[in-house]
Amino acid sequence: RIEQMKETPLEQTTKIEAQLIEFRRLLHSEPELSEHEFKTQEKIIAKLEEFGIPYRKVGKTSTIATIKGKNAGKTVALRADIDALPINEDLDLDFQSNNPGVMHACGHDAHTTMAMGAAKILNEVKDTFDGEVRIFFQEAEETFEGAKKIVADGGMEGVDAVFGMHNYNTIASGSFYSGPGDLFSGCDTIHV
């Protein structure tokens, strides 16, 4: 019921843009490898607590935030990966990785930040929608283990749909692409 909202999602996002940029840069400067995202989880939990959003820890370092709407309804999950890669960051940034040999080369710091922004806004407008939104801050995406832990800990129980996202440089900024079924749902390891 977007007509019940006092501000559009874009207006709400613009209001918290500086806060989200700061959060993303903090995550970027302190990356952690799969299944070692302990400080990352602490930062996520601190932000969820600041925003008054209920959560629970699952797996080793995953967190599920839960936002319940006005009435019962469908349950939708948004998934953001939180782990970094074992790559040295050679960029000269004010918020460059402080963890030698580890960086957010795949944009998981941005994914986590976007999910956190969505969580904040959805929590503020929860009286305008029915159902439940779960935000999965998923550990160990790069090792293909994190989603299994969320499922094993019951995170998917009652979920009607899951939306994950990834930055993609051929899609214009401010736009998104979606389609039916799985998109980009494959993984493999190549040894050279």
Which residues make up each language-model segment?
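Acidic/His- and Gly-rich active-site-bordering loop/insert found
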Residues: 5-104, 109, 113-129
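Histidine/acidic-residue-rich, glycine-tolerant segments that coordinate divalent metal ions
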Residues: 93-103, 110, 127-192
